[in-house]
């Protein structure tokens, strides 16, 4: 053991040289030989630049197999127990060619902090540089989309017009500090100082100031930080803030903040997904729906409905996720409904904990879903295997939830008893917003909105997927900005037919990144990006 300690400390000469361990030089050479062959196999495998630690979602890039890693892939069966601690196990590491090529073939680090509190040398290494995210300007002409990269070369047909209202929206999961600390295994790749809230919040606020969005939809907003720092800071920047904390004893929630100069507040509608009377809905996620009136003095303008949510993470509870989504859509339908029967423009943001192409994602965009025979673990696309999973029940949620299969609040005809002058009783029907008569059982879900996604989820030139979150265990897209598009956009993204008062035109979006891009700066969080999610940002135009 003394010999091993000498090697681990990096000493060139040790007590072995004095003859106490005469066989140690022989074993050292043997160690190098035993490592060479597995290393060569590992090196060859890692030259595939598309290898990723994230799981493959439907419609994934066909040239990138994205395998699950295990020791059998790399012949890494030899592992001296005294050299590796549990926190450095292979399945938690992100193997990147740029790091591996710079590492010696025999790396014998104990990953133990010294008495002065310094971090391991592998974590002290800083990844320098900032990845630039470009604006992508998108204009629609005769149902054909033109995309221009950069801030200067704007299509002339996208220039300002008189009868319009332009605004920008940011959706950002800012990573609750309590959740970060409770799930520290997801951030083993990070330097410890960048994980402190005192370091992270100034960075997050700097991003918000830089992008200067008119509307902010924030998730994982910790309640104590919101009251002490986040809300006062945003109010000083000209925002009005509304917040909905998660139910139960959860410390975070969702916030929607908007610029006083752009909007006035018409209504605030929090949505709690926990229902004590329904066993299915035993989770504490929430949503928040605001109705905002654009401030345009010279023209009449419809209100804009903005929704924000953070759906359940659990990949194996797709039944709960779909029910939470239905509850949010029902509230949006109630808030966005106009007196003439139409719906005002809608922007729906959040962390949906579902990947592109999944049944839940398709339901949002297409406006319909037949879930008959669908395993609950397949709903969000996070689970690859459906083995041992039960099938979604029909219907998914019980009648007493008060929401129909069309994702709207149901109206029941409830008998009301009144007395007449002759003391006779008669039954009179009265409308209420409480449920409910049982519908004919159907496995078809629908909603009333034609929603498009701001992002396309894949880079068109390469087919490599965009990433909105990246930590030690995955790098995928789970964050979205959906919007009710004008007709020429809807033609490219078929959805439910609905009457809209105008529609939103997507003018621009802030480009996303690939997993490979993010690992060049040591993933998320890092020195410049202080959440494990990227902020999503879009610019819209409402034609008047």
UniProtKB/Swiss-Prot annotation:
Pfam families: ANGEL2_N (PF19339), Exo_endo_phos (PF03372). InterPro entries: ANGEL2_N, CCR4/nocturin_mRNA_transcr, Endo/exonu/phosph_ase_sf, Endo/exonuclease/phosphatase. GO terms for molecular function: catalytic activity; mRNA 3'-UTR binding. GO terms for cellular component: Cajal body; cytoplasm; mitochondrial matrix; mitochondrion. GO terms for biological process: 3'-UTR-mediated mRNA stabilization; mitochondrial mRNA 3'-end processing; negative regulation of mitotic cell cycle. Belongs to the CCR4/nocturin family. This is Protein angel homolog 2.
